[in-house]
Amino acid sequence: GIRDFCLSRGLGDVYKRQGVGGNAGSLTLNASGGAGGSGGSSLSGKAGAGGAGGSAGLFYGSGGAGGNGGYSLNGTGGDGGTGGAGQITGLRSGFGGAGGAGGASDTGAGGNGGAGGKAGLYGNGGDGGAGGDGATSGKGGAGGNAVVIGNGGNGGNAGKAGGTAGAGGAGGLVLGRDGQHGLT
């Protein structure tokens, strides 16, 4: 769902929507978490943030992707939502959800990318979301960590105007590689 609110300012109303997080997976079945909603747009204020991805079920399943941040014409783009975590236990792979991308802005700052979700015991961490483009770019989100066996998620790229890229997530303790650092 999406949460709406309206702020009255002297020159008119500023309408903003904020993404709401995805539903969690079932606690007993192999269900994956739902994706987070995208943030709404804004003319001059900070746009709505993307909702966080839902966590996976207890045994199997992957985390949901974070929602993308909203676009802002003259303000700051919304931040991307965090990816949901993979399942806690079980013998099958549970991947972390990808982080949402930061929202763009024409004249303001881009939003920051969301962090990738942490993997379950087995599986890969989610990739971080890209930073939003703007006069100053948003930061890329960090990649999610793997736990026992699996690769860390890759860090998100910075926006086009430069900025800080996200760090890669750590690989699994037993087997797996670290995620790659995002590009600037």
Predicted regions and their residues:
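Long, distal/terminal scaffolding or interaction modules
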Residues: D13-T184
